[in-house]
Amino acid sequence: MTDLTPREIVSELDRFIIGQKDAKRAVAVALRNRWRRKQLSDDLREEVYPKNILMIGPTGVGKTEISRRLAKLARAPFIKVEATKFTEVGYVGRDVEQIIRDLVENAITMTRDHMREEVKANAHQAAEERVIEAIAGSDAREATREMFRKKLKAGELDDTVIELEVADTSNPMSMFEIPGQPGMNPMGGGMDLVELFGKAFGGRTVRKKLTVAQSYEVLISEEADKLLDDEAVNRSAVTAVEQNGIVFLDEIDKVCARSDARGADVSREGVQRDLLPLIEGTTVSTKYGPVKTDHVLFIASGAFHIAKPSDLLPELQGRLPIRVELRPLTEQDFVRILTETDNALTLQYTALMGTESVTVTFAEDGIAALARIAAEVNQSVENIGARRLYTVMERVFEELSFAAPDRSGDEITVDAEFVEANLGALTRDTDLSRYVL
């Protein structure tokens, strides 16, 4: 669990997302409240429930990006799901309880990786012994083993090919998986058939030829797993989900039944009804045991283009008490997105062209022109936010990307003239830009 302060969380999010101060602050406070709750006495801790968040804003303004960055910051079990992927209980498809099962699976992986780090030193030693045995043989004298150990540590044996008995990781029962729902148990929480048969066929080993360098990763992973207590991993992961789990529910507006809607849309309310107990707090049965969702934090987001937040079921609105509105992006925001973020498209295209030995530099007027065109097309066609920059940049670099291998050593300056030459005609022809940009 992260112990960053709200100010630190916001400044970390600022590196990748421009603007949206309110949304960042709400998310930062929610994350910090997880840490605060852990400092309380046991009886009070049980009474403090998370305040779930509803983020409302047009497409392409940073809702999903906030969730993606939050997942890396949280250091807690985290899952991002689209509400549209789920169906009402009783219909074919995934029911909403699968969200918690997937969250537990993520937590198991995270906990296992964390615990592996703790036993890595011992696992490394055991892996070293197995490599030496594969090279020198099991009946080699201690002096011989010591000689190989020195060579191994010096990296002299990295390219030597050895034959090892390693665990067979292939799943012999994968053919029995349900199409479209890999590894999922149609019956809900218990152990699924694939896993059951997988365990029956488990414990098999195969002989593999690997170089010493390649074998280390495989062997360390195997030896670490031998040192881990599966029961402790599962227990720790379930506790982490119950106390610190975070679920990001994207596209929540797509399961709203609009007040004027008729027919199939109305059945979407079933998904909302199924979400109610999950968000309020219920017990979900998983193959690792029952999981209580009382203290899982839910962050829902939606564009609410057609539906309105008031079209959500009143009970669901009540379970998402913190409302945050994200504002549409302006031309000035686009300039900042292209220059200030750590993963700016300008940096990406410069690096991509650099692989072909083409040096690309962006002039200030070039960046301003890109931002202006993106903002204009958003206004005149459809406002898709920062995603418009992808389309504009791709069109500007289309010719250069194609010819780059033949232009090795060239230096290109992306200024207003370059942007105009590659995009000008399209932006002036509104009908054409409607389809191309």
Curated annotation (Swiss-Prot):
**Which compartments does it reside in?**
Cytoplasm
**A GO BP term, please?**
proteolysis involved in protein catabolic process
Matches recorded under Pfam families:
AAA, AAA_2
A GO CC term attached to the entry: HslUV protease complex
Q: Which GO MF terms are attached to this record?
A: ATP binding; ATP hydrolysis activity; peptidase activity; proteasome-activating activity
UniProt-annotated binding residues for ATP: 18, 60-65, 250, 315, 387
Does this entry carry the keyword Cytoplasm? yes
Alphabetic keyword roster? ATP-binding, Chaperone, Cytoplasm, Nucleotide-binding, Stress response
Does Ribosomal protein count among this protein's keywords?
Answer: no
Mind telling me which SUPFAM superfamilies this protein's record contains?
Answer: P-loop containing nucleoside triphosphate hydrolases
Which InterPro entries does this entry report, sorted A to Z?
Answer: AAA+_ATPase (IPR003593), ATP-dep_Clp_protease_ClpX (IPR050052), ATPase_AAA_core (IPR003959), Clp_ATPase_C (IPR019489), HslU (IPR004491), P-loop_NTPase (IPR027417)
Q: Which CDD domains match?
A: RecA-like_HslU
Protein role: ATPase subunit of a proteasome-like degradation complex; this subunit has chaperone activity. The binding of ATP and its subsequent hydrolysis by HslU are essential for unfolding of protein substrates subsequently hydrolyzed by HslV. HslU recognizes the N-terminal part of its protein substrates and unfolds these before they are guided to HslV for hydrolysis.
User: Which NCBIfam families does the entry link to?
Assistant: hslU (TIGR00390), PRK05201.1 (NF003544)
Q: Which HAMAP family match?
A: HslU
Q: Which family does it belong to?
A: Belongs to the ClpX chaperone family. HslU subfamily.
Subunit record text: A double ring-shaped homohexamer of HslV is capped on each side by a ring-shaped HslU homohexamer. The assembly of the HslU/HslV complex is dependent on binding of ATP.
UniProt protein name: ATP-dependent protease ATPase subunit HslU
What is the protein's species of origin? Dinoroseobacter shibae (strain DSM 16493 / NCIMB 14021 / DFL 12)
